């Protein structure tokens, strides 16, 4: 039993748990001289600060506080508790903001201490030494590794299966010691690039570089720990939270002493080459060695010279301005050269210009090599007057005014293979360059295991066209999810990939439109089947969403309009894409939409339009229309539904039905459930989506009809 002394000197006995908080209400009423109401407060159980601070006029009248003066005193005092609470919250917020500010400042100072230069990364070698490497201008993993390999001591170079020393980048790996999981993390290529170019990743000061046949040694791990402790030491200046990190590090050090660290990402080799970015053409032109790391440098230089000359010939013969959108390396370099020359000419005095300048000569494009003589120059001397090579002949001769201009882009007879920039439905996509013209390309490639598989040529085009429907029907029978499944061997799957690639080639030959990726041709070489496609600098809708988040509605309407224009063109050609989704919509750096990946597209003919056969289940599940899921019809209206799903992607940053698995999504779509329309879309945008998601495909509008929708007219930008 607790005893409390009151102001009058009498003892107040509190004998049960219900009245444990009486001292507060009693002191509250005593302070303002209203103790006569104490019994009323106790009877209504208004005894704590939380209950008293919410008192109002009506409650006080109900408690029997009838005097206005008493009510005012009680209310004024109770409201002061709320003010005190708000002041306390504000002070706590200020303290929190000060801590965050000090954390940011300390982190910056820490980074500047550990990584003195902005573009530098510290690599730890297996002998425990460390190398600081400037990665400025290296935008893929191969170029970063290549820059370090040139500085490796001979004893740390990798050896191949024949025991020979190798400097090939694929023979080296990069690890980072993850102290939170106590594992050695084997970095994917994209992880390495991200860490090297991020300003806030402290791992960039302790990357471990080893040959592929080795794992990080104890010396390398020890050096990594020392650098990590320096990081913790810098963090310890921020606040008490760093003490936990220090304690954690001690535990890790103890655990590491007991045994070997576990290596994470052991399955890295499966996707180590995927670097899903499409940099601008001008970016590539300034870092050719980085984007074509496996290409012989002399061959690359020869291609650059020929491309530059080719562009100069056409520019003079046609008197054409150089296109700002060209993907031709020669055009880009010539444009840069002309821009510099023009700036120099404008700075000359007009009188000196007329007397000293010979306008019949074209200035040569020459770039000096960097100070580092060991570094392979990324800027090439394209026109050298002193060069005695056979291919360096002067192209301003007797026939300089007779120029043969190509009417269309021909299939490249020789091309250079660059970095992997993505993957499609079948095979990988690489950056490529026409070795003769310097034109950049995206090359879709799949390995051919069966030598009797050939690429259709113009001579057998008609035969392939006649057999196309039969092959397509057979392919659909194999791929049909709803059909009875048979065991699939690797050979059958591989054959399907090659068939799909040939099918895509047959379709792309017929397509010539601004919003469809351009087809340059195909070839079969070195056990690979290649499709040469237009290189679209920028990226896909899905990659943009991953990088930047959902789009503004005005941008969505702009992209949707272009998608529908491309879809309308396909439908006019009786072609159904069947895989319209964000990953297959490319956006170049000028905002132009390009539809790509026709691996499962279908060309309708009058014959299969009339056939009443079960449709195949083809496409990406979350973008499928009800008639495709139910396998009731194969019509162009499926692309309209998928386009609506892409609009949902752009609004939300996620695919439709993001909370469901593929099987759950199939069930939802099959039971006539439409994707949820974003509540923040405009009324016209919602109406557009409702029309695109019309369940009955016969009433669903066509692409041309949707292009006339008011939503697309209201936001023309």
UniProtKB/Swiss-Prot annotation:
It holds the Pfam family Pkinase. Residues 452-466 have a biased composition (Polar residues). InterPro entries: Kinase-like_dom_sf (IPR011009), Prot_kinase_dom (IPR000719), Protein_kinase_ATP_BS (IPR017441), Ras-bd_By2 (IPR029458), SAM (IPR001660), SAM/pointed_sf (IPR013761), Ser/Thr_kinase_AS (IPR008271). One of its GO terms (cellular component) is cytoplasm. Residues 20-84 form the SAM domain. Keywords: ATP-binding, Kinase, Nucleotide-binding, Pheromone response, Phosphoprotein, Serine/threonine-protein kinase, Transferase. One of its GO terms (biological process) is pheromone-dependent signal transduction involved in conjugation with cellular fusion. Signal peptide: none annotated. ATP binds at residues 421-429, 444. Residues 452-481 are annotated as: Disordered. Residues 415-712 form the Protein kinase domain. It comes from the Eukaryota. It catalyses: L-seryl-[protein] + ATP = O-phospho-L-seryl-[protein] + ADP + H(+); L-threonyl-[protein] + ATP = O-phospho-L-threonyl-[protein] + ADP + H(+). Its EC number is 2.7.11.25. Transmembrane segments: none annotated. Gene3D superfamilies: Phosphatidylinositol 3-kinase Catalytic Subunit, Chain A, domain 1, Phosphorylase Kinase, domain 1, Transcription Factor, Ets-1, Transferase(Phosphotransferase) domain 1. The modification Phosphoserine is found at residues 323, 465. Homodimer. Interacts (via SAM domain) with STE50 (via SAM domain). Interacts with PBS2 and SHO1. Serine/threonine protein kinase required for cell-type-specific transcription and signal transduction in yeast. It is thought that it phosphorylates the STE7 protein kinase which itself, phosphorylates the FUS3 and or KSS1 kinases. Belongs to the protein kinase superfamily. STE Ser/Thr protein kinase family. MAP kinase kinase kinase subfamily. PANTHER family: MITOGEN-ACTIVATED PROTEIN KINASE KINASE KINASE 19-RELATED, SERINE/THREONINE PROTEIN KINASE. Present with 736 molecules/cell in log phase SD medium. This is Serine/threonine-protein kinase STE11. The gene is STE11.
């Amino acid at each position: 039993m607790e005893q409390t002394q009151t102001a009058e000197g009498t003892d107040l006995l509190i004998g049960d748990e219900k009245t444990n908080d009486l001292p507060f209400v009693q002191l509250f009423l005593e302070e303002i001289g209203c103790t006569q109401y104490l019994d009323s407060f106790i009877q209504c159980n208004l005894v704590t600060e939380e209950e008293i601070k919410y008192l109002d006029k009506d409650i006080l009248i109900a408690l029997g506080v009838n005097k206005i003066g008493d009510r005012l005193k009680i209310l004024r005092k109770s409201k002061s508790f709320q003010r005190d609470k708000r002041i306390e919250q504000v002070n706590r917020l200020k303290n929190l903001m000060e801590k965050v500010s000090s954390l940011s400042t300390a982190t910056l100072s820490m980074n500047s201490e550990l990584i003195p230069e902005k573009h530098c990364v510290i690599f730890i070698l297996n002998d425990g030494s460390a190398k600081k490497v400037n990665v400025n201008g290296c935008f893929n993993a191969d170029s970063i590794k290549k820059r370090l390999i040139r500085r490796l001591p001979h004893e740390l170079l990798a050896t191949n299966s024949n025991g020979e020393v190798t400097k090939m980048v694929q023979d080296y790996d990069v690890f980072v010691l993850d102290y939170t999981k106590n594992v050695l993390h084997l970095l994917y290529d994209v992880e390495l690039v991200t860490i090297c170019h991020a300003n806030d990743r402290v791992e960039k000061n302790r990357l471990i570089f080893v040959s592929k046949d080795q794992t990080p040694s104890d010396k390398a791990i020890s050096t990594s720990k020392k650098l990590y402790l320096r990081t913790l030491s810098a963090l310890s200046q921020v606040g008490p939270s760093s003490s936990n990190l220090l304690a954690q590090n001690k535990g890790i050090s103890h655990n590491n002493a007991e045994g070997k660290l576990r290596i994470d990402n052991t399955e890295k080799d499966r996707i180590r080459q995927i670097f899903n970015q499409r940099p601008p053409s001008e970016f590539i032109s300034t870092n050719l060695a980085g984007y074509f790391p496996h290409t012989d440098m002399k061959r690359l230089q020869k291609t650059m010279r020929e491309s530059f000359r080719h562009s100069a010939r056409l520019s003079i013969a046609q008197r054409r301005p150089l296109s700002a959108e060209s993907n031709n390396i020669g055009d880009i370099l010539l444009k840069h050269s002309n821009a510099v020359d023009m700036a120099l000419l404008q700075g000359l005095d007009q009188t000196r210009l007329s007397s000293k300048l010979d306008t019949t000569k074209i200035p040569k494009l020459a770039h000096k090599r960097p100070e580092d003589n060991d570094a392979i120059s990324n800027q090439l001397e394209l026109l050298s007057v002193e060069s005695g090579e056979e291919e360096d002949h002067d192209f301003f001769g007797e026939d300089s005014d007779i120029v043969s201009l190509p009417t269309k882009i021909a299939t490249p007879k020789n091309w250079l293979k660059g970095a992997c920039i993505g993957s499609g439905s079948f095979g990988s996509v690489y950056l490529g360059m026409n070795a003769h013209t310097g034109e950049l390309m995206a090359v879709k490639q799949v390995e051919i295991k069966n030598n009797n598989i050939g690429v259709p040529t113009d001579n057998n085009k008609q035969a392939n066209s006649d057999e196309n429907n039969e092959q397509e029907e057979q392919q659909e029978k194999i791929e049909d999810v709803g059909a009875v499944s048979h065991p699939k061997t690797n050979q059958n799957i591989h054959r399907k990939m090659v068939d799909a690639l040939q099918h895509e080639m047959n379709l792309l030959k017929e397509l010539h439109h601004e919003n469809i990726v351009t087809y340059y041709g195909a070839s079969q070489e070195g056990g690979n089947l290649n499709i040469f496609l237009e290189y679209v600098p920028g990226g896909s809708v899905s990659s943009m969403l991953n990088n930047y988040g959902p789009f503004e509605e005005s941008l969505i309407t702009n992209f949707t309009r272009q998608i529908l224009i491309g879809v309308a063109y396909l439908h006019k050609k009786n072609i159904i894409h069947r895989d319209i989704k964000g990953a297959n919509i490319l956006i170049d750096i000028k905002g132009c939409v390009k539809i790509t990946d026709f691996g499962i597209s279908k060309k309708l003919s009058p014959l299969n339009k009339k056939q009443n056969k079960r449709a195949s289940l083809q496409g990406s599940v979350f973008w499928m229309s009800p008639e495709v899921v139910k396998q009731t019809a194969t019509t162009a209206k499926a692309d309209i539904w998928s386009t609506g799903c892409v609009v949902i992607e752009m609004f939300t940053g996620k695919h439709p039905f993001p909370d469901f698995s593929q099987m759950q999504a199939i069930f939802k779509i099959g039971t006539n459930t439409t994707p949820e329309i974003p509540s923040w879309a405009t009324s016209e945008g919602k109406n557009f989506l409702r029309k695109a998601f019309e369940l009955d495909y016969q009433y669903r509008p066509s692409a041309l009809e949707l292009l006339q929708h008011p939503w697309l007219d209201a936001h023309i930008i």
